[in-house]
Every structure is written in structure tokens, then in C-alpha cells.
Amino acid sequence: MSDRDGDAAATPVDVTGSGDDRALGETVTAARPVHPYVHVVIVAVLGAVAVFAWLWVYEEVNRLLWENAFVTANPWMFPVICLPFSLLVGLLVKYRHAPTMLGESMLDSLSGDVSAIKWRTLPLNVVAAWASLFSGAVIGPEGGIGGIASKIAALYGEKVGIPIELRSMLVFSTISSAYNGLVASPLFSGVLGAELPTDPKVKARTMPASLVGGAIGYLVFFAAGSSGLQNYLHLSPDQPYKPVDVLLVVVFGLLGLVLALVTGALFRAASAVFGRFEGREVERALLAGVIFSAVGVVAPILLFSGETQIQAVVGNPAAYGPAVLIGMALVKLALLAVAFKSGFLGGPTFPAIFAAVCVALALNLLFPGIRIDVLIGGIMAGSLFVLFKAPLMVILLTAVMLQAGPELTALIVLAVTAVMITLPYILAVVAGRQAARPA
């Protein structure tokens, strides 16, 4: 008799009325004296502390490298710093098989078989993510954070002997813990447990684990003094909401969809270029470093994740003008594609937000009568939904960053819903055209 069968036989399923989930071992037995949710709590704390420490090191070293007076006064220093870290990224990928963003995303891995997560690459994940970010590449920290958190859960699950069927609880707990701490919302990634798993039994286990882990991560970061992304852009709209905003936010959501489609086209172009470097990972990373360096010498505000740079743009968008802001958005997305397709490790969230906000600011300069938070909320939510395919998570993220009240939250929901309805038709048209092309 297997362990799973033994646990099922010892479980009072008729008392709970939920025999399927109980049969998976979510009880205390003689063979397993610790309840699974004790492990969920432990890995949530471990994940939050580890990710907070990783972020602290990143921010301190990044400040030392890039935010000193000498570097800011001498743009020619950009390649001096960027290229060695780009070389390190290439070496780690080629000779140590460090994780990259060339395959599936973190959300893709969560919706698949989490038991396939390779915890032995945790040290490489830590170093590769740091090197990618220190290079100035247009990539956010969330990709590295997700990898670190998930691998901590996988390591804990294997060493403690957690049954395979329960390890998804640990992974969702640590992921939610890390991301909720980063965003500073107790609910943000808790919805991952509801949106990503397709198996109802898996969803029934991961949802509570996500909520528990997310709350713990939020509290750990809060206790450490992290403000996260609350009121991230510090907007102060002075116009009242108008009935026309209901229609406008739908248009802005669809504009975000267009921006996401442009992003996809840029990714395909970057893939065509950097795909020629298969087996030459070092040269591929160095080429990307040269591109980043060239842009950094001319326009350093377009490099890095954009997490802090966008706040400077929001502070004085008129200094750039509509045309330049649109150009900045496109260049940012192109550089994001370069980073992803050349083997750098990170996430797309902050660069995508940078681009969406730049487009919104450009439109606000042209149409100053429209509330800026409606513009940003619609475009940002529309583009991020196409990116993540997780509507509740996107709504929560956008609402947190804009410090949205009920009115703006309702408008954000409309923008996301409009994109959800429209996107399948666009994908069907694209698929039809591809099928019609001669082989």
C-alpha cells in the first residue's frame, strides 16, 4: 500500500465531506505528524526573509554602482559597468546553465508541474539575477524573485520530505509571500492560487496556501519598513470623474492591448536576431550589453527596469513632449525584448509599466482634460493583462500602484474586461492569417 493510500484510509472523510482533498494527505497522521499548513507558514517566512535580503543587497549594490556622482556625470562609464556584467551573464548561461527567460515564464511554470522546479539552480538564480540587473539591462527584479522563491520551496519540500502532490502549496506560498512583500499588498498574488491552476483539486490546495503565504510576506516586508508599490506614481488628478470615463477607459484598455501586441512583435524581431547566436551565449549577452551601453550613453533614463526612472518622467512629462514619450515607450519595449532574448534573467513588469505610463502621459499632454489616472489605469491594465493572462492579479496590481478608490477600480475592471473580450478575436484573426500563408 502506498503512503497516499494509507493516508486516505486513516482520514475521517465522512466528517468533512471533502474526501478528495483530504485523501491527498492534508491531515495529521502518525506517519506525518506535522500538518501541511505548518510547512506552508515556514516556507512563507523563509521566502519573504530570503527575498527581502536579496532585494536589499541588490538595491545597495545598484546604488553604489550607478547612483554615484561620478557615474551620473560621465555617461561614458555606462559600458565600463555594463559590459563586464553582461559578460558574466553570458558565462553563467553558457558554462553553468544559469536560468534565463528564454523558455517559459514564472507564471507558466506555476500553471504547470511545479515538481519540475530545479532547486539546485538556486545559487545560479541568485547570481544571474543580480548580474542581469547590475548590467543596466531593461529587465525587472520580479523574474529573479520568482525563481528564488519557488526554488526555496522546492528545496524545502524535498529535504523535509513533503509529498509530491502537496509541494505546489509550498511553491504558491513562497511566490505569494515574495510578491506580496514586493508590492506591499496582502492580497495581490494571493489570487494566483485561484487563477493559474487548471486542476480543481490543485486549486483547492493552492488558494489557501497563496493567501496564507501572501499575508505573511506582506507582514514581513511591512515590519522591515518596505513601502512597496503603494501609490507608486504619486498622481494628484484634479478633475472629477465623468460619465464619459466609462467609455474612455475601454478605449485606453484596448490601446494597452495594441501596446502589448507591439511588444510581441518586438519580441519576435529580437528572437530572430538573437536566435542566430544559439550555442554562442557569451557573444549573445555581450551584443546585448553593447546595445544597452549605447543607449545608456545617450539616454540612461531608458535603461534599467524603469521602476524609479518612470517617477522622474511622471514628475515632468512636458519636458519630453508627446512624440518623445511615445518613442521612449517603444525603445523601452525593444530593449526589454533584447534583454529577454539574449539570456538575461528578470521580469517584464516594470519595463511594461514604464512604456504604458509614457504612452498615457503623451496622451495626457495632448488631451489634458482627461484624468491622468484613468489614462494610466486603462493602458497599464490592458497591456499587463495580455502579458500575464491573470485578470484579478492585474486589476489588483494596477489598483495598488494608483492607490485606486472604488471609482477608479471599477474603471480598471472595465478596461481589463474589454481586453479579455477582444483578445480572442484578435488571436483568431492572427491564427487565420498564419494558416493561410503558403508553407
For every predicted segment, state its role.
Residues M1-A439:
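Alpha-helical transmembrane segments and immediately membrane-proximal extracytoplasmic
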